[in-house]
């Protein structure tokens, strides 16, 4: 998205849980706007992972003395701003804007399922920086212990994981 060039203009440009990995959102949103046709629409969804209890648990563990040297700089990989940041950019570009936050309620079989799901998303950049498989397993175990406290099991043993998301749509 930061280097994509084309003369073609699109009626719809969308992103689902991707732009948090790309820096410079003001420049990025302007580039995406410029890809739109005269009456085009930009639709973006951003996971607000760092605002969730699970994101806070992972960051707390990462800042622990044992892990800090290995996980230093991970937060720099995430580019997530507050709603007003995005509104101010979009309002300069678009005629009409819709914005909202919501929680996707994931119903998972266990707390281990949370760890499995997060190992390929928000937990992944932390795990990639750890030196050994043993460190990765220890880190995940520490996160799991706190996750169990933050997300209690339901009566049927399932675990509810509300996953916070920001959506915005800009209409040219």
What is the role of each PLM region?
Residues 93-95, 116-172:
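C-terminal lobe and adjacent flexible extensions of AdoMet/dcAdoMet transferase-like proteins
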Residues 2-13:
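A short acidic, Gly/Pro-enriched loop at the edge of an enzyme's catalytic core
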Residues 11-26, 48:
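A short SAM/SAH-binding and catalytic strip from SAM-dependent methyltransferases
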